[in-house]
Structures are given as C-alpha cells and as structure tokens.
Amino acid sequence: MKEGEIFGLLGPNGAGKSTTMEIIETLRKKTSGKVIVDGIDLDTDPGKIKKIIGVQLQTSGFYPGLTLLELIALFSGLYNQPVNAYELLELVNLQEKAKSKYKEMSGGQKQRFSIATTLINKPKIIFLDEPTTGLDPQARRNLWDLVRSIRDKGTTVIITTHYMDEAEQLCDRVAIMDEGKIIALQTPDKLIDDLVASGFEKPKITKAANLEDVFIQLTGKDFKDD
C-alpha cells in the first residue's frame, strides 16, 4: 500500500479481508508472513503502529445517550490527544449536531461521526470496514466525498467494501482477495482494461443514467441522509 492513497480490499465473504485488516490493526495475531506499517515491524513494535493508525468503530461501539461533543471528549481522553471538537465535526459536516445525542443521528451521520473519531489521534493511516453498508445512494456518495477529502489532506485510507461501484469510483488501487490470498493488485481502471483486452464482452448499457441517478436527482441535497 502506498502513502496517501485510498486502497481497497475486495473479495467474497470469507476471503480474509477483515482478518487482514485486524492483523494490520494489531487486533489479531498473524500466523505467517511479515507486516510493516510506515516502516514499523509489527513483530517488534506493535505499540508504535497503534499510535499512527485510526480504526473505525462499528455503531455499537458508541454510548447512545452521549452527545457528539461528549463522545469526542471521551475518545480524546483515551488517546490522551487534545482535539478541537468543533473543527473535527466541521470536517464531517456535523458541527450543527455537536450537542445532539448519538442515538438521534441518522445512519449516514453515524457513519460520518465514526470516521471523525478515527482522526482524533491524528493518524497517518485509517481503516474503514464497509463504511457505507446500509446507507442510501446519496449518503453513500457523500461519504465517498468525505473519504476523498481525508485522503487529499495526506491520510492513507484502507477500506473494505462489497460494492464494486464504490471501489471503482473511490479507490486509487485495489487488491482482490480469495481464500486468504491476493489474486490481483492494480488500479481499478487497469484491471478493467486488462479484462476487456482479454476478449471479455457483455451487453452494452445504452442509457445515459440509471435509477440511482434518478433517485439522487430527485431527492439529493448535500449530506441529505435522514
């Protein structure tokens, strides 16, 4: 994985995506191989790796009765890292929800907040495990914009997803895994071009738009995810 890119891990269920992520995140012991994160060897100094990464919590990892400000203060204390909560919330367009309770957030807002918490310790790398699962099309695209903005500020993003359109639109490079092994590693465009060059064909789609485009055109507003 290269510094400053959005890197996607793709594969069917059971391929090893989440296991690979958990090993790199120091949450699971590896059985073989070597893991180097920003020049740090996982075997010799996992503590240093923990200091430079941010891991997205699932929605069940937050206290529902606390406000967003209270949750940020909690995580800031755990990391022993002072943070301007309003600036952090502004980054994910939740500044107006600062004093709202977590349980009052919509699905898209909860996902954006969970990404915000990965940035509290100012990490070099963040890990997002299927961050758009369950979101409507507009909320998904808004989250893509957020992930790109984080990448553009210099943070490396590692993401797993089952949505191939998401990987194609969002990722600079992807690794396709199957049965615990990487079977392809390249940019989405290069993988597609190689497949076409091999003689692959499918019926051409003649319409210039699809139902998702209609949905977003009719309902879409910036960060509309209620």
Describe each model-derived feature in a short phrase.
Residues G33-D41, K48-I49:
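Conserved ABC transporter NBD signature motif
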Residues A73, G77, P82-K97:
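Conserved ABC ATPase "signature" region
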Residues K101-M105:
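Conserved ABC ATPase signature
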Residues K122:
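Conserved catalytic motifs of ABC-family nucleotide-binding domains
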Residues I126-E130:
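Catalytic Walker B motif of ABC-type/P-loop ATPase nucleotide-binding domains
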Residues L185-Q186:
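ABC ATPase "signature
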